[in-house]
């Protein structure tokens, strides 16, 4: 089931035949939880041969108007204006996923315990993203959030001080996890690696007004340091070192914790859900297939939130039964 505002927008961008294929394909994707073209062609409800259905879907994926800017961005804008007040603080996570010969850069909007893809692109080489690719992808989505307070979250691949400076110039807050071998100036002309600051499990530290990066040092940043406490068998291997401008340790840690939503999103879209790593599509067809998957995935999230607001989720989801004691069951049988 596709939300009404999705259908209204898609009808404006597609012909009647294209809209019918789109909505049918989204319904199939939601029911099958698959984006593999062969699987979709096999179950697509159209009275032609499987090979003809596969070819029909390939032609659909090649449509020139099937783009992120035309199909997806207006839906994001509608959702923001409808459900988010102007000035609301929103978190955007950046990440990269690689499988086979595919290197995918993803920008996502953090939702409660999940994330929704905003923009994605295929990197030309199988390597970490660089400053240019990071800023190019962020430039695509930041204009959508001009009326909101944005925090960009990134793991250690995105620990570039240059990226922090670029975000600061854009008026965007950030929490970028640093590598432990980065140096900061603790005293005048005294530089220390982050892992030499004496942070141990159960301790934290917040550094302000320190120079960061021994080569081409930069000022104006803050570094939040936190090593979670060990509990029994639960051992935390290393500390968090986060480059930020949020002003306090608590704010930085609470913001960065939200980045885990993009990990859950990738799990839902990979082996735990739509299995987009299993598709053999490449290039523009893969980008457009991820667009369709995003429409199916996000519509399910939006509808789930609406059901929660109506407090009817207990009637449409599987009830979790409590584990019964075997002895109690045996007692009932004997009686």
Language model region names:
Residues 1-34, 46, 53, 71-73, ...:
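Single, function-defining residue in the core of a domain
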Residues 54-114:
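Active-site-proximal, Lys/Arg-enriched surface segment
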Residues 37-47:
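DNA-recognition alpha helix
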């Amino acid at each position: 089931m596709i939300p009404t505002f999705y259908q209204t927008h898609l009808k404006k961008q597609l012909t009647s035949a294209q809209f019918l294929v789109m909505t049918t394909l989204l319904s199939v994707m939601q029911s099958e939880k698959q984006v593999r073209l062969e699987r979709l062609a096999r179950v697509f409800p159209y009275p032609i041969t499987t090979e003809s259905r596969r070819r029909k879907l390939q032609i659909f994926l090649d449509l020139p108007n099937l783009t992120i800017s035309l199909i997806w961005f207006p839906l994001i804008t509608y959702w923001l204006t409808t459900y988010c007040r102007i000035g609301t603080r929103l978190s955007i996570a950046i990440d990269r996923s690689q499988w086979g010969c595919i290197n995918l850069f993803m920008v996502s909007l953090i939702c409660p315990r999940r994330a929704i893809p905003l923009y994605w692109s295929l990197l030309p080489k199988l390597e970490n993203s660089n400053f240019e690719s990071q800023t190019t992808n962020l430039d695509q989505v930041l204009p959508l959030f001009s009326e909101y307070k944005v925090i960009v979250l990134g793991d250690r691949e995105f620990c570039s001080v240059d990226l922090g400076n670029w975000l600061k110039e854009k008026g965007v807050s950030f929490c970028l996890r640093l590598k432990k071998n980065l140096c900061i100036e603790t005293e005048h002309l005294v530089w220390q690696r982050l892992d030499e600051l004496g942070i141990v499990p159960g301790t934290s530290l917040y550094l302000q007004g320190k120079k960061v990066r021994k080569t081409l040092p930069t000022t104006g940043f803050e570094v939040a340091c936190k090593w979670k406490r060990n509990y029994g068998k639960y051992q935390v291997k290393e500390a968090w070192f986060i480059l930020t401008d949020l002003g306090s340790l608590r704010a930085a840690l609470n913001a960065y914790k939200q980045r885990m939503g993009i990990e859950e999103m990738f799990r839902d879209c990979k082996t735990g859900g739509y299995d987009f790593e299993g598709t053999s599509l490449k290039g523009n067809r893969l980008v457009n297939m991820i667009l369709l998957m995003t429409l199916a995935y996000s519509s399910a999230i939006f509808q789930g939130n609406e059901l929660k607001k109506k407090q009817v989720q207990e009637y449409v989801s599987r009830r979790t039964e409590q584990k019964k004691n075997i002895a109690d069951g045996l007692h009932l049988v004997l009686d």
